[in-house]
Amino acid sequence: MTTSVLVPSSLAREAEDRREATRKLGYVARAAAVYRVDRLTVYPDPDGAGKWEDGFVETVLRYAATPPHLRKEMWGKRDELEYVGVLPPLRVRSQTGSGSEGSGSLRQGIVTEVGADGRVRVNCGMQHPISLPVPADMDVEQGERVTVRVSSRRPVRAKLVDAPTTGFDVVAADLDAALSRDDAGLTIASSRYGEPVTSTRLGQLAERRDAEGGMTVAFGAPERGLPSILDVAPDAVGGDQTSDEPEGFDLWLNTVPNQGSEVVRTEEALFASLTCLTLTE
């Protein structure tokens, strides 16, 4: 089952400075990690662009999703990453559930060199890059991210494995393209104008999500909710969309009914929505 989250490129538009913008994006990445999101998609919102350069949101989120031991190798120094020190740690669990220091744990690495002898050098957070044989059924290239199973650190015993990397992927795509993916599942728009979520409705949502093989949940930006971004009248959205609506969602939901604040920030909406929508029966 695939869980995808869509956020706009204008996500940090109201932040006063780059530090605050980076901190805000860190909370978004943290929500994606906590709720085991598989894919975090940044969709364009040119009309809501703020003071930050094009690509800033995607770059910071990609950096946050990169395992700490690979960040220097993959990113170096970039202006957009000036304040990444304020990002919260994600502490993404490995696919095995083992800690990164445990025997038999899975670690992500980056291929730094491909040899002619069927071996590669991989930086996977050990003291030095390690040389590993490439399994016959694998084809890897320099710069590629790979999964390494470490069975011992002293002496080093490790091997490349054909396993999915942990954490979530960050991609950029148009909203229409993201909603029309084969693995999009149940498509949900999070909006204060949507149908209020109730305890009775949650069971129905979980059943429908599982039947669809996952879900895609979209969010708006500060002072620019999804109706504004999509140029849709707020009173035109509701719960189930029974016809071919231009917005392309199966459901419009309000996961913070009776909100006590005039504005629910996007990062707050992520936690509120994913808490409800990832519940199981």
Swiss-Prot record:
> Pfam families, from UniProt?
Methyltrn_RNA_3
Instruction: Report the SS bond pairs.
Output: none
Q: Which CDD domains match?
A: HsC9orf114-like (cd18086)
Q: Which SUPFAM superfamilies match?
A: alpha/beta knot
User: Please, which domain of life does this record's source organism belong to?
Assistant: Archaea
Query: What protein does this entry describe?
Result: Uncharacterized protein rrnAC1612
* Naturally occurring in which organism (per UniProt): Haloarcula marismortui (strain ATCC 43049 / DSM 3752 / JCM 8966 / VKM B-1809)
